[in-house]
Amino acid sequence: MDEFTSDSLTTSRLLRQISHSDSLSSVGSSSNRSNSNYENKINNGIINDFDSTNANDGISNNSNNSNNNNNSSSILKIHQSPQSILSTEQQHQIQQYQQYHQQQIYESGYVPPHVYIFDPDYKSNNDEEDKEKRSLIELNKSTDLSNIKTTTTTTTTTTPPPLMIPENEEENKQLRQEILNELSKSESFTKIKEPGEIYGFCECSLLYNHLTCANLVITSNYLIFLPQQQVDSDYVLENYLYKKGDFFWKKYWFVLTPDSISWYKSSILKETHYPNGTILLSKIVTVDKLDPEETGKPFCLQIMTNTSIHLIQLDTEPQLEHWYHEINRMQKNLNVTIPIGDIVSITMESNAALFFDSLCLTLKKGENCLVTPSSSSNEVYSLLIKLWNRNRGVTVVEPEKQQRLLEFQKTFKLSQGVNLLIETPCVFYQDEEFSYEGVLYATTEGTLYFSSLDSVLIIPESDIYAITIDRKSDNRDALKVYTTDYDVLFFDSIDDIETFFNVISTSLARSNPKIFFSTVGQIPPIDEPKHDEKEHKSTYQTISSGIRSWKIPIPSLPNFSIPIPKSIPIPLFRSKSSSHLDPQNSQQQQQQQQQSSSLQLDDNNNNIVIPHTSNPTTIIPSTSSSSAIPPPPSSTSSTSSTTHEKTIIIQKNSSINSTFHDIFPLLPLDETVIMFQNCSLYYYSYDSNVEGIVYITKSYIAFNPSPLDKQQQQQQQQQQQQPNSSSITSTTYDRDLDTDSDTDSESDFDYPKQSQHDNSVVMVNNNQYKVKEVLMKKALIPIEDIVSVTKERFLLFFNQCVKIITLDHKWIFGSLNNINSFYNLILETWKQIPKTLLDSSSSSSSSSSSSLLSSSPNNNNSDLNINGNSEGSIFTPLESIKIKNKLGLPADEVLITWFNCTNFKGAQLKYGFLYISNNNICFRSKFGFQKRTIVIPLSQVIEIKKYSAFIPNGIKITTASHHEFQFASFIHRNRVYQILYETWLKANNKKSNSSNSLSSSPTITSPLAISPSIASPSITPPSSTPPSSTTPSSTTPTITSPTIHSTLPSTVVYNDIQEIIDGENNSNNNNNNNNTNNTNKSNSFIGNVEEDVDKIKRSIKSLPILKIHSAQQQQQQQPKTTTTTTSTTTTNLISPRLLTPLTITQSPGFSSLVNSPILPVKPLRITILTIGSRGDIQPFIALSLGLKEYGHNVTLATHELYRDLISKEFGLNYQPLGGDPRELMDLCVRNGIFTPKFIKEALSRFRSFIDDLLLTCWKAVQNSNTQVLIATPGCFAGPHIGEVLQIPFFNAFTMPFTRTRTYPNPFAPFASHQMGGVFNLATHVMMEKVLWQPISGQINQWRTETLKIPPWNSSVSINETYRMPYLYCFSKYLVPKPPDWSGEIAITGYWTLKNQANSDSPPDDLIQFLNEESSTENDDIPIYIGFGSIVIDNPTALSLLLIEAIKLSGKRAIISQGWGGLSIDEHNNNNNNNNNNNNGENSDSNKSSLQSNRIYLLKKPVDHSWLFEKVSLVISHGGAGTVAASLLAAKPTIVVPFFGDQFFWGERIKQTGIGTSIPFDILTAKSLSSHIISILNEPSVRAKVNKMSHLLKREDGVKTAIDFIHRYLPFSFIPPREIPFSSAPNSCMGCKQPFTLLHVMKARVHCHCCGKIFCESCTSHKCPIKKYRINTPVRVCDKCFNDLQSNPSSNSFILND
């Protein structure tokens, strides 16, 4: 008996704890334990002593069993002790007992989760097993332990059984309905089409590519794995990162979603909706952080998938850690669906070291996954076997019979099970030269199978001509089987030949009455063959006669207990489009055959071409049962896919075919080798070539790499012959000649191969060998997947090579001895593919994603093609793939047609092609350096109409977000219009039908496969109709909710929107208002735009986005949401934690901060320095409150004007700063910021202000005993204080203030003008000098006298020099992140207050004014006009202008008095005020504002978030806070900028199409009134501002900022300024050795950590300094080196440090 050691127990227990780390709330709950009616009485002596034996392993005992620990004796000890002897039978029974209770003895206090089984026949099937368990328990009780000195005290405990089986049918229905109700609230489950009836539910761990914990839902059609560890489905991590391409690194905008990693060219998605590339998280095998020495670059992530390797470089170490952990975290939230029909085998893996009691599932694609149930593995295994057999149409009751059938299936390599009719031992022979003893089987399908130790014989029913009993045999009667080609097979030594003959004759007579039967040995009648058959027979008569000449070997079969074939341990690399071995594809292939055979081969020949001939009497046709070509849509036959057409005899362990099938055990037996050669295969995906042998069969091209040591020897010999070329390895790629100049290289990561030093060459070569050892895979290329075959020269091989392009990969075979034969054979085999199969495969590619995942491959959506032609007849397969890759379309998209046209955007015309597919309208420009790519989902289109403007024959397409796309110059505009219109209607009808049927028959979505770029020209296909894209009918495993393009924009407001598309038609919004309104009424398909949006809302089904929330989040949101309906069943079943009900209605606002969260860092003393107006201060109040809620001690230092607001109203610590914001505001408004007049007056008036500000900042930080400092650039003192105190420092600002080419500096005089990247960058450099030069003397004097540090003499700021972390409190949707901003810069979103102060409650007369309605209009919502803290030079003139504009617009208005002192002229409003004076509602003494029917003057500050919700339009000065409040309230904005950043915000409002900007210098009443009317009457503006508001409310800027601060705390220190040599002492500051004339040769060296000067001996150490973001080793002094080694992370405030 195998002993269960403590090591294996520890490993198993750890795996179980991993699997149960996130268990369901219903599992092991108190209600289930209290209501359990089951009792499991066991002998606790075994368990307790076993626990005490492994006490060192951390296994705790239950309190109920604590009294038995000292007195009990373990049976395991008895067995292991040499003095204790048990009988063999007792040892075997105890071993069975231990295996059965393995799940319950890890921890005595552990209760396994329940496994729900709803099979009504399950209990009866397990009665015998229950009896066996009870007998084992009784055996344990009666075991004689007299040899043990200590007595055993046996106690019983009552534990809830892990298996939950309903008592009756009613309870069965109730439990099933309860779980179904929970599952129906999960989008991952509802998207599955026809999931079937639920039979089981349990927790498990799934090992597929990576290990995850999941909940397994077992239905009659699927195995559905839902995640246990939930993450926020709306959470998106995005930033600019570098990705390794073919040769260079390129920066992309990376977006991490809950199911994929996608990258785009830029963060502004106004050119395309689809990414440049995508990595499915489900396909990721490993994510590793690479050492800089391996890649030559720091902060690199290596992401390895099934087929490729991607290398990504990040900017900082915190960013690297953040992405690394987020990718691993989101992998735990994936959903995997496995159709039961795709399972090839299910076995129980009980001997594995880590995964005992696991279920090994082998899938059709050759993939394997391990499922480890939390408990009751045997019961789950039995249930899966039953459902699997039922799905295959096989009825198996006895386990022995089931195992025998599985062994039979594996023996004959059948992909589907069969029903055995009878079997008998016999001797098979055809002549005296060979005979085999074995077993003859007959199945209900009529096929005869014979198996022996040396051979396998398969005689299909279609090849049987006659069966007789030979009475003339010498020994006993023999059974003679005649084939249709008149070969005779003898089966002798059958025990009861009469019975066997009667059974098979009865069965065959029913299926094929033409078969001749005789019991007396009568010779069957022979029909004269037809003329063509005679010629065919005579052609091969000299080659083969009889079965002897076509003996085909098969490999030795693996043991039954291990389902994975034991072949050479090299992974298999398949073409992902149709590399699976689909058994349901033989019907169509049997129509047209490729006849092939193989003669006896010489294993020693390196270049063997087997004649492409066959004997039709003996060779199975080319259309094997395992071929991957799908049947045509009309094929509905349910015949077993494992049937053969001709008789096959296969000898084991002989010739090359035996070796071939040993290497590729999953291939069917009839795949014989036609040719094999030694060659080199260049793996294009990995940029590596591998030596090996290529095999060609009738259906596949297979490659097996040679061992790595042989390749190394060959390469070393080549390097010795060519010593000069050893240092440089060729990295030449075969580029696509048709590739555009802007086409990004999507090739996967290749390690660096060039070096200048010999040592680095050795390291690089070693890395290459290591990579090849990891990536060396067998290749299996289905011939039907081939798109093109070319013979050309490739620089890597120097000679000619054969390039094969499939649907998803590129294969290059070189170093071929007989390249012409290899090329011709592949070309000839490719030509033999039946044309009907190609047509069916091309038509099947047009099927929808839901049909791809259905079990039936017969669905076809060819009606999507308007022209009635399939995609293959318009576009060749290679053209189709190239077009989809350039447009970023998914692989299953069906291209319908294309047209030449021009696209009009702004003032630019682009000529190109308009592509129409079944789901999108696409445009791709042809000329120009920068290509224009536009992808418009048909689901977003609300209007298609003809128009003629600047360019003739135009068509305008309008989306739901009111973006207009104009295409013109169509030669046949009517035809284009008709196709677009019909395709649009069909797409919307399909979406509507699928949406309406979602509740009854939910659909499943397939993963969106983004094929890699195929960069190679192809030759003309060899046949008239080339092979087109084949759609795999197998879909295992499938991610049920892959949102690869989760950033795809959908209908405004109604769906989740990830990005806003700006810049499409913003310049023409105002010019085309009247034209748009008129055409909407006359020429549009749907008259009213609002009705269009409503209809699209009802009909559109957007891309699926996961929305499963955690239980904690649901509990927090529950008071704000509608109550979910509870089940009416009486069963006390608690909902599983991960299947929590989804909220139907949620608050549109952002989620609030978590109360009392677990602090990631220690509580810190944080000081925030800021100055400015109320709008500048308020965001930092929100940040301070958030930090305080996290447990930090926050001090906010600002002007004395805001003391009461900060300390009294919000309860924050306050420190005063110098200066009056009113004086600064008045100076800026009167003179303009940073003008010569402004600088002249500022130097005279504000020199004392700067000195006072610097001193008060220093005092505020000292008084607060600051540990972390956050400051705005306007305080000037922030980075200098952070440098002297050596504390973490963060910049924070409300506008972009970092150098970039995307935006100009907001304070620049021309900030509102976009003049290119060089100009924008120059404005930042100019403003840095303008800000620094006037005050540099004061700051340096303050540094030297007060801070005691050297002066800062550089004109480049400290922030730019050291790349300090920067927090920007605005939205990425309004100001997208520029590509040249690194990871230290975070755009967090707006910092808004959760609750405003009570003192800002609105006055009663304002509420009354808002509630009044105009007598002329029913909906006369007022507009808001206010300029906040702007000090206006002439407030009376501005007030009159505003009143006049309000009168012209005919709107009601609220005017805020603000700091500018706006007022209303009483004379202009006498008529409107008479009614109010007569009513006497307001007295003259207490009147705080003037109220009229049209205008209200607001004198008291009111909360903008409350007020803006009540108005229709906001007119403001463009301050950052006011703009944020208006956007959050979803109100259009008119910005009247006065100075500074207000011009920048006005320009951003105008560019995004949510308002406009009118500079104050050119403001007139007429222009203002016209803009008010146009904006309020423009539907597109309302739609865009609603979208923007929805996006902003989803952001949580405060939480994002706090997370960023915590993440960058260890890396936000400012290095101390190096002491100048001129002012340094004349001696080393370490050893004190003088630098005098006697030591003039002694070098002086700066320490990069402390900045002091030392000699070389005192700075001999080098190391990176992470807290200063210095990642390369630099010189440091001995003291600093010791400090860095003792605390390498410099993160003393981290809790877990």
UniProtKB/Swiss-Prot annotation:
Mapped zinc finger ranges (FYVE-type): 1622-1685
Family annotation (Gene3D superfamilies): Glycogen Phosphorylase B, Pleckstrin-homology domain (PH domain)/Phosphotyrosine-binding domain (PTB), Zinc/RING finger domain, C3HC4 (zinc finger)
Biased composition (Low complexity): 584-628, 711-722, 1026-1047, 1065-1084, 1112-1130, 1469-1479
Annotated transmembrane regions: none
This protein's UniProt keywords: Glycosyltransferase, Lipid biosynthesis, Lipid metabolism, Metal-binding, Repeat, Steroid biosynthesis, Steroid metabolism, Sterol biosynthesis, Sterol metabolism, Transferase, Zinc, Zinc-finger
Enzyme's top EC category: transferase
Matches recorded under Pfam families: EryCIII-like_C, FYVE, Glyco_transf_28, GRAM, PH
Residues that hold Zn(2+) 2 according to the record: 1647, 1650, 1677, 1680
Protein name in UniProt: UDP-sugar-dependent glycosyltransferase 52
Originating species: Dictyostelium discoideum (Social amoeba)
Primary gene name: ugt52
